[in-house]
UniProtKB/Swiss-Prot annotation:
Phylogenetic classification of the source organism: Eukaryota, Fungi, Dikarya, Ascomycota, Pezizomycotina
Transmembrane region(s): 1-21, 30-50, 81-101, 119-139, 140-160, 177-197, 200-220, 241-261, 274-294, 310-330, 331-351, 366-386, 403-423, 487-507, 543-563, 647-667, 668-688
UniProt GO MF annotations: NADH dehydrogenase (ubiquinone) activity
Similarity field: Belongs to the complex I subunit 5 family.
Single GO BP term: electron transport coupled proton transport
InterPro entries: NADHpl_OxRdtase_5_subgr (IPR018393), ND/Mrp_TM (IPR001750), NU5C-like (IPR003945), Proton_antipo_N (IPR001516)
Entry keywords, A to Z: Electron transport, Membrane, Mitochondrion, Mitochondrion inner membrane, NAD, Respiratory chain, Translocase, Transmembrane, Transmembrane helix, Transport, Ubiquinone
GO cellular component: mitochondrial inner membrane; respiratory chain complex I
Catalysed reaction, written as an equation: a ubiquinone + NADH + 5 H(+)(in) = a ubiquinol + NAD(+) + 4 H(+)(out)
Pfam families attached to this UniProt entry: Proton_antipo_M, Proton_antipo_N
Protein name in the entry: NADH-ubiquinone oxidoreductase chain 5
Taxonomic source organism: Neurospora crassa (strain ATCC 24698 / 74-OR23-1A / CBS 708.71 / DSM 1257 / FGSC 987)
Record-linked NCBIfam families: NDH_I_L, PRK06590.1
Compartment list: Mitochondrion inner membrane
C-alpha cells in the first residue's frame, strides 16, 4: 500500500506523457485522475494507520550510494508528519486533476498537461516521504523542474517563458544554500539520514547548528516565497489556473515550511535561527499583505495572500509551535486552493480576463462561485468557526504567549498583516461580485442569453431547437467564453473544498494542536522543553488579545464596505492626490524590489559576466592561445629576418661568434664548466644584436636617401 502511494502518480504520468497518442485525451485524463484518486484513498488509510496508531513505516528499496565512508539508501518513511502532509497534497492534487478536465478541455495539449500534473504530484510525494536529506533534495529539485514546465505550459507566450525562468532561477539561489547546508551536515556527522542526524543533533556545536539552520532557512525562503526571494511567486501566475492552485496552495510553496518542520530537531538547538524565522515571517506577512492590497489582478492578489499565510507559518516555526504551523499549512491548503479554483471559474466565465476592476455584478450569474469564494475568504480572514480560524488565531496568540519583546512585536505586526488581509479579501469579493457591472457589455448579454436558453431547455426538454436569426448572429459574434457556472467537473472540486474550508479545522484541531493529543508522539516534530509555550498560549494570554484580531477583522471589513458604497468619491479623490498617487504607485510596484534587484544585482552580475568574458575568454585565453601564438611567431620571424642585412661584415661577425661558441663549448665540456662560456656567449650576442640593429638603421637611412634622390631626379 505504501509503495503504491509513491508509484501510482509516476505510472499515470508516464502513460499520459509517453503513450498519450495511443490512449487519447480522455484516456490520459482518466488514467491520471484515477491514479491520483486511488493514491489519495491509500494516503487517507495511511493517515489513520500511522497517525492514530503511532506505527511509523519505513521502506528501503535499494542502495543508492555505497562507499567506504558513506552509505545511503533509496528509502521512504511514513511517520505522523509525512501522512499529515500527504493529506492536503493528494486531496488537492486529485481535485485539481478533476477540475482540469473541464478547465483545459479546449487546450490541444491535454496529455502533456496531465502528465506534468501527475509528475509534479509524484515529486512532491518523494519530497515528503524521503527518509534522508539527499532523497528529499531529489523531490525538491523535481518540484522545481515541474513548476518550470507547468508555468511555461503555454510556451508560445513570452510572459509565461519569462515567469518560468524567473521562478527557476530564484529557486536556484535557495537550492544553492540548501546544498551548502547538506554539505555541512555531511561534514559534521558523516551522514544525511534523518534518524542519524536528528539523534546526534544535541551534540553538534551551536555555531555549526546555526550555520546549518541558516542555510536551510534560506532554502526554505526561496521555495516558500519569503521576503527577499519572493519575486517569482506573483510571476508564476502566468500558468494555467489549476497549476496556480496546485503549486501555490498545497505543494511547492509549502515545501520550504515542511523542510523547516522536518528539521525541527536541528533548528531547536539554535535560538538565532528561531529568532530569524520569527522576524522573517512577521515581515513577510505585513509586506505581502500590503502589496496584495494594491494589486488589480485577481490571481496575483491571491498569490500575495499565499505569501502572507506562509509568513504566518514561519512565525509559528520561529515560536517552536511546529504542530500549529502544520495545522495552519493544511487548513490554508484547502481554502487557498478553493480561492484559486474559484478565481479560475470567474476567469473562465469572462473570457480569460483577470483584472477584477472589469468584473462587477457577477453574483447573480455565478452564484456557486460567489458562495465558495465567500466561504474561502471568511476562512482566510479567520472568521470564527471557519477552518482558518482555528490555526491562524492560534498563531497570533502563540506570538503573544511567548511573553518576550520579539513575541509581542511580532503579534502586533502580524495583526496589522491580518487587517490588510481582510481589506484585500473584501476588495476582491466586492469588485468581482457585488459592485456595479464594470465589464464589457457583451459579457453580461452573453450571461443573460445563455440563462434564457438554459431555462428553455430545462422546461421543454428540447436539446435541439432553432434560434431567431438575430440571436444566432449575436451568439456567433460573442467571444469564446463559458457563461454562468461551469459543468460538473468544474463545480465538484469547489463544493468539496468549500466543505473542507468550513469543517476541517473544527474536526481536526484536537488532533494537531490539542494539549492531550498524542498524534506526534513519534517525535517527527521535536519541541525543546524550554521552548514549549502551548500552556501559556491556552491559559495565560488575556482574552482581549485573543479577540483583538477578530475585532479588527470585522471593523475594517465594515469600514471598507461603507467607504466603497457610501463614500466612493473619497477613495477616488485620495487616489488622485499627489500623496495617494505616490503611495499607490509605490505599493503597486511591490516596494520597487524588482527594480532594486534588476539595477543593483542582475545588471551588476551581467556586467561582471561580460567583463569576465571579455578579459578571460576573449582576452587572456586568446592571447595565450592561437591569437597570441600567431603574434609571437610573426614577431620572431620578423626579428630573424631583420638579421639579414646584406652586409658582409655582419655575416663575418656571425661566423666569428659561431666559431667562438663552438670552441668554448668544446673547452667547457672538457673542463666540466659552462659559466664562462655562457657569459661570453651572452656578451657576444648582445654585441651582435646591437651591431645588426645599428647596421639595419644605417641601411634604412641609406635606402631613404636613395629614394629621396630618385624622387628629386624625377621632379
Amino acid at each position: 500500500m505504501y509503495l503504491s502511494i509513491i508509484i501510482l502518480p509516476l505510472l499515470g504520468s508516464i502513460v499520459a506523457g509517453f503513450f498519450g497518442r495511443k490512449v487519447g485525451v480522455s484516456g490520459a485524463q482518466l488514467i491520471t485522475c484515477l491514479s491520483v484518486i486511488i493514491t489519495t484513498g491509500l494516503a487517507i488509510l495511511a493517515f489513520f494507520e500511522v497517525g492514530f496508531n503511532n506505527i511509523p513505516v519505513t521502506i528501503n528499496l535499494f542502495r543508492w550510494i555505497d562507499s567506504e565512508w558513506y552509505n545511503i539508501l533509496w528509502g521512504f518513511q511514513f511517520d505522523s508528519l509525512t501522512v499529515a502532509m500527504l493529506i492536503p497534497v493528494l486531496i488537492i492534487s486529485s481535485l485539481v486533476h478533476i477540475y482540469s478536465i473541464s478547465y483545459m478541455s479546449h487546450d490541444p495539449h491535454n496529455q502533456r498537461f496531465f502528465s506534468y500534473l501527475s509528475l509534479f504530484t509524484f515529486m512532491m510525494i518523494i519530497l515528503v516521504t524521503a527518509n534522508n536529506y539527499l532523497l528529499m533534495f531529489v523531490g525538491w529539485e523535481g518540484v522545481g523542474v515541474c513548476s518550470y514546465l507547468l508555468v511555461s505550459f503555454w510556451f508560445t507566450r513570452i510572459a509565461a517563458n519569462q515567469s518560468s525562468m524567473s521562478a527557476f532561477l530564484t529557486n536556484r539561489v535557495g537550492d544553492c544554500f540548501l546544498t551548502i547546508g547538506m554539505f555541512v551536515v555531511l561534514w559534521t556527522l558523516g551522514n544525511l539520514d534523518y534518524a542519524t542526524v536528528f539523534s546526534l543533533a544535541p551534540y553538534i556545536n551551536s555555531d555549526i547548528a546555526t550555520i546549518i539552520g541558516i542555510c536551510l532557512l534560506i532554502g526554505a525562503m526561496a521555495k516558500s516565497s519569503q521576503v527577499g526571494l519572493h519575486v517569482w511567486l506573483p510571476m508564476a501566475m502566468e500558468g494555467p489556473t489549476p497549476v496556480s492552485a496546485l503549486i501555490h496552495a498545497a505543494t511547492m510553496v509549502t515545501a520550504g515550511v515542511y523542510l523547516l518542520m522536518r528539521s525541527s530537531p536541528l533548528i531547536e538547538y539554535s535560538s538565532t535561527v528561531l529568532l530569524l524565522c520569527l522576524w522573517l515571517g512577521a515581515i513577510t506577512t505585513v509586506f505581502s499583505s500590503l502589496i496584495g492590497l494594491f494589486q488589480q489582478d485577481i490571481k496575483k492578489v491571491i498569490a500575495y495572500s499565499t505569501m502572507s499565510q506562509l509568513g504566518m507559518m514561519v512565525i509559528a516555526i520561529g515560536l517552536s509551535s511546529y504542530n500549529v504551523a502544520l495545522f495552519h499549512l493544511i487548513n490554508h491548503a484547502f481554502y487557498k486552493a478553493l480561492l484559486f479554483l474559484g478565481a479560475g471559474s470567474v476567469i473562465h466565465a469572462v473570457a480569460d480576463n483577470q483584472d477584477f476592476r472589469k468584473f462587477g455584478g457577477l453574483k447573480n450569474y455565478l452564484p456557486l462561485t460567489y458562495s465558495v469564494m465567500l466561504i474561502a475568504s471568511l476562512s482566510l480572514v479567520a472568521f470564527p468557526y471557519m477552518t482558518g480560524f482555528y490555526s491562524k488565531d492560534f498563531i497570533l496568540e502563540s506570538a503573544y504567549g511567548q511573553f518576550s519583546f520579539s513575541g509581542v512585536a511580532v503579534y502586533i505586526i502580524a495583526t496589522i498583516g491580518a487587517i490588510f488581509t481582510t481589506l484585500y479579501s473584501v476588495k476582491v469579493l466586492y469588485l468581482t461580485f457585488l459592485a456595479n457591472p464594470n465589464g464589457y457589455i457583451h459579457f453580461y448579454r452573453h450571461f443573460i442569453l445563455y440563462e434564457r436558453l438554459y431555462v428553455y431547455v430545462s422546461y421543454t426538454g428540447k436539446e435541439e431547437f432553432y434560434l431567431p436569426k438575430h440571436m444566432s448572429k449575436e451568439i456567433n459574434n460573442l467571444p469564446r467564453s463559458v457563461s454562468g457556472e461551469g459543468g460538473f467537473f468544474l463545480s465538484l472540486p469547489l463544493v468539496i473544498l468549500a466543505l473542507f474550508s468550513i469543517f476541517f479545522g473544527f474536526i481536526t484541531k484536537d488532533i494537531f494542536i490539542g494539549l492531550g493529543s498524542n498524534f506526534f508522539i513519534d517525535n517527527s516534530l521535536f519541541i525543546h522543553p524550554i521552548h514549549e509555550i502551548m500552556i501559556d498560549t491556552e491559559f495565560a494570554v488575556p482574552t482581549l488579545f485573543k479577540l483583538l484580531p477578530f475585532i479588527f477583522t470585522i471593523s475594517f471589513s465594515l469600514i471598507a464596505l461603507v467607504l466603497s458604497e457610501k463614500y466612493p468619491n473619497l477613495v477616488v479623490h485620495f487616489k488622485l492626490s499627489r500623496l495617494g498617487y505616490n503611495l499607490f504607485g509605490f505599493f503597486n510596484q511591490r516596494f520597487l524590489v524588482e527594480l532594486f534587484y534588476n539595477k543593483y544585482i542582475t545588471n551588476l552580475v551581467l556586467d561582471l559576466g561580460g567583463q569576465i568574458t571579455k578579459i578571460l575568454d576573449k582576452g587572456s585565453i586568446e592571447l595565450l592561445g592561437p591569437f597570441g601564438l600567431e603574434k609571437v611567431l610573426i614577431k620572431w620571424s620578423k626579428d630573424i629576418a631583420s638579421l639579414s642585412t646584406s652586409i658582409v661584415t655582419n655575416y663575418a661577425l656571425f661566423i666569428l661568434v659561431g666559431f667562438i661558441l663552438y670552441v668554448f663549448t668544446f673547452i667547457s665540456l672538457l673542463e666540466g664548466g659552462l659559466d664562462l662560456n655562457l657569459s661570453l656567449f651572452i656578451l657576444l650576442l648582445s654585441l651582435t644584436s646591437s651591431t645588426s640593429s645599428s647596421d639595419s638603421k644605417e641601411g634604412k637611412m641609406i635606402k631613404k636617401a636613395v629614394v629621396s634622390t630618385k624622387n628629386k631626379n624625377i621632379r
